[in-house]
From Swiss-Prot:
Catalysed transformations (reactions): Hydrolysis of proteins to small peptides in the presence of ATP and magnesium. alpha-casein is the usual test substrate. In the absence of ATP, only oligopeptides shorter than five residues are hydrolyzed (such as succinyl-Leu-Tyr-|-NHMec, and Leu-Tyr-Leu-|-Tyr-Trp, in which cleavage of the -Tyr-|-Leu- and -Tyr-|-Trp bonds also occurs)
Lineage of the organism: Bacteria, Pseudomonadati, Pseudomonadota, Alphaproteobacteria, Rickettsiales
Protein known as: ATP-dependent Clp protease proteolytic subunit
Organism: Rickettsia typhi (strain ATCC VR-144 / Wilmington)
SUPFAM superfamilies from the UniProt entry: ClpP/crotonase
Self-association and partners: Fourteen ClpP subunits assemble into 2 heptameric rings which stack back to back to give a disk-like structure with a central cavity, resembling the structure of eukaryotic proteasomes.
Length: 201
């Protein structure tokens, strides 16, 4: 069972306790730091919508350390990022693989960052299906549709030709932050808070 630190703050009404993630949410910081699946995606979407309702003009910061996960769950987060009014800055800490890399590059252009020792990985979607031959065929067609959609999204956010994206995603494609910047997945590599602040001036 994982332990989540609690922060105690003094208020006019006395002490108030927050878990660390809730306290950071007050600073408009959202963490995507586990496997992307439906439950966590719903929580991330809810946080994005809450921060938009609180202040639609103030930026949101999404910190990503994820191995990827379920495509539809990731697309729920991605679509919400594009839907809401605030700009969403993304920052890779550790890893942004598979759907994690789509969320990373889906941040506001010019506000997509990576720390210097992170790893980023893109690849085509995978699926393993059992059952009747007709059902397997249906799922295979759906996987190909999702592959085409993801290729188009990566092409849009990296400004790379679709053919180049298709070739680059045929197998697991691991990148350093420098390679990810050259590819168009991130805009800047930062090593300090001050460096990030300078880029926002």
């Amino acid at each position: 069972m994982s332990y989540i630190p609690v922060v105690i703050e003094q208020t006019s009404r006395g002490e108030r306790a927050y878990d660390i993630y809730s306290r950071l949410l007050k600073e408009r910081i959202i963490f995507v730091c586990s496997t992307v699946e439906d439950h966590m995606a719903n929580l991330i979407v809810a946080q994005l919508l809450f921060l938009e309702a609180e202040n639609p003009k103030k930026d949101i910061y999404m910190y990503i350390n994820s191995p990827g996960g379920v495509v539809t769950a990731g697309l729920a987060i991605y679509d919400t990022m594009q839907f809401i009014k605030p700009k969403v800055a993304t920052l890779c800490i550790g890893q942004a693989c598979s759907m994690g890399s789509l969320l990373l590059c889906g941040g506001e252009h010019g506000m997509r960052y990576s720390l210097p020792h992170s790893r980023i990985m893109i690849h085509q979607p995978s699926g393993g299906y059992k059952g009747q031959a007709t059902d397997i065929e249906i799922h295979a067609r759906e996987t190909l549709k999702i592959k085409k959609l993801l290729n188009e999204l990566y092409s849009k956010h990296t400004e790379q030709a679709l053919k180049h994206i298709e070739k680059s995603m045929e197998r697991d494609n691991f990148m350093s932050p420098g390679e990810a910047k050259k590819f168009g997945l991130v805009d800047n590599i930062i090593s300090s808070r001050d460096a990030m602040a300078l880029l926002h001036k």
